[in-house]
Amino acid sequence: MTINCVWEHNGRDTLLYAVDFVGAYTRGETLEAAVRKMQAEICSYLKWCGKKAVTSMDIAIIEEKVSELAICDADSDVLFESERAPLTAEEYKKLKALALKSAQDFLALYDSVPDKNATAAPERKTFYGQVPRTA
């Protein structure tokens, strides 16, 4: 299987996005480090979707974005070429189903937190006020 990827970097850090697996990406200090993580990311993604994992894959860089942002913090400003075209009704339905599955999974995770007011994070203020520290 070939995984088409968009490589976003700032010369020091890398974000590598799997174009055909919405939301799947890896990070690394180098492109090579991010590529090494991609198979595990795709296998995890396929498992989440209820699909069979792949045993081998090739990575194809189909687009590159040089960024001025702090890639190490996962800041991003890339827009994939494949995202520029209008969505078909079928593409919209598939993306909507993924978003709803993600929301349902997040809600299940949130609901599993026994004490939503408990925190292990220290208090921290910004110029906007207190940073949230609980579920």
Task: Identify the function of each model-found stretch.
Residues 1-134:
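Aromatic-glycine hotspot motif
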